[in-house]
Amino acid sequence: GCIKTGSGCTLSKGCCTKNCGWNFKCNPPNQ
């Protein structure tokens, strides 16, 4: 699942999945 960019990531990093606490894993938009 991906959350909208801006929650700890920039647009260039695609989408992010919430990992743990304040940490976010950023993945390319195609994942």
From Swiss-Prot:
One of its GO terms (cellular component) is extracellular region. It comes from the Eukaryota. GO terms for molecular function: sodium channel regulator activity; toxin activity. The modification 4-hydroxyproline is found at P28, P29. It is found in: Secreted. Disulfide bonds join C2-C16, C9-C20, C15-C26. Confined to the epidermis and to the mucus layer. Keywords: Disulfide bond, Hydroxylation, Ion channel impairing toxin, Knottin, Neurotoxin, Secreted, Toxin, Voltage-gated sodium channel impairing toxin. The keyword Transmembrane helix does not apply. The keyword Secreted applies. Toxin with similar potency against both insect and mammalian sodium channels (Nav). It inhibits inactivation of most Nav tested (B.germanica (BgNav1); EC(50)=97.5 nM, human Nav1.1/SCN1A; EC(50)=125.8 nM, rat Nav1.2/SCN2A; EC(50)=137.8 nM, rat Nav1.3/SCN3A; EC(50)=138.9 nM, rat Nav1.4/SCN4A; EC(50)=150.2 nM, human Nav1.5/SCN5A; EC(50)=108.4 nM, mouse Nav1.6/SCN8A; EC(50)=92.8 nM, human Nav1.9/SCN9A; EC(50)=102.2 nM). Inactivation is completely prevented by a concentration of 1 uM, resulting in sustained, non-inactivating current. Belongs to the nemertide family. Negative results: does not show effect on rat Nav1.8/SCN10A. The presence of a 'disulfide through disulfide knot' structurally defines this protein as a knottin. This is Nemertide alpha-3.
